Amino acid sequence: MKKLLENWNNFLNEAIDPRIQKQIDAILELPDIGVLIYKGSMMGFTTMSFRYVRIVDKDTKKYSILTPQDTFIRKDRKTIKTGIPNGYVEIREPLRADGPCLGGWVVGGSLATTGFGPLLYEVAIEWSSQNGEGLTPDRKSVSTYAGRVWANYMSRSDIEKKQLDATKEDPVQRLTRPVADDCSQVKSVAVAGENWMNSPFSKMYSKSNTEVLDALRAAGRIIEE
């Protein structure tokens, strides 16, 4: 276990978000917890999911799905946290109603044990940056917790931000004529009105490296289907 932590520390650099480092360290303290990356589809559009799993055999890619019941135990009428995370982030290609969105992926849904969501988002952003142009928040609904994640990305110097435009269906004026950057701004307008372009939900985010994915792969904590 000490060796795994040393290997992880070799991947760290000054730019990495400290919350991500903390979550990686917590994962590596557990002997068999990793992240499953798998492909799906929805209405003819490709989806990708990033989910915490228990790795049974990394060589054969055998795993078991974690559930909320894995995150705590009941003892002496008390609820005790096990330290095992549960959760997922699902992303998808932009739907027609979304707009082109600069070719980025769009978050379709997410749920995670408190404190372990940002790591899944980090993996999703790195993957989407290598397999597309980046990642943008759900265009209509973002939870308060997820909103803090996006606000953090907006302030990080190692994350590239690209402004997305409104679509013709949005009740605000578009910023430019070209449509390639058009992306539904329902959530941005709902929280910021005419200043929607200043909302963290109005951007597409990307990352130039895969340091977190590389570290998790090196530790045998990524399963890809």
Map each language-model feature to its residues.
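Residues forming the Rossmann-fold NAD(P)(H) cofactor-binding site
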Residues: 118
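Non-catalytic substrate-recognition and accessory regions of acyl/acetyltransferase enzymes
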Residues: 8-114, 122-225
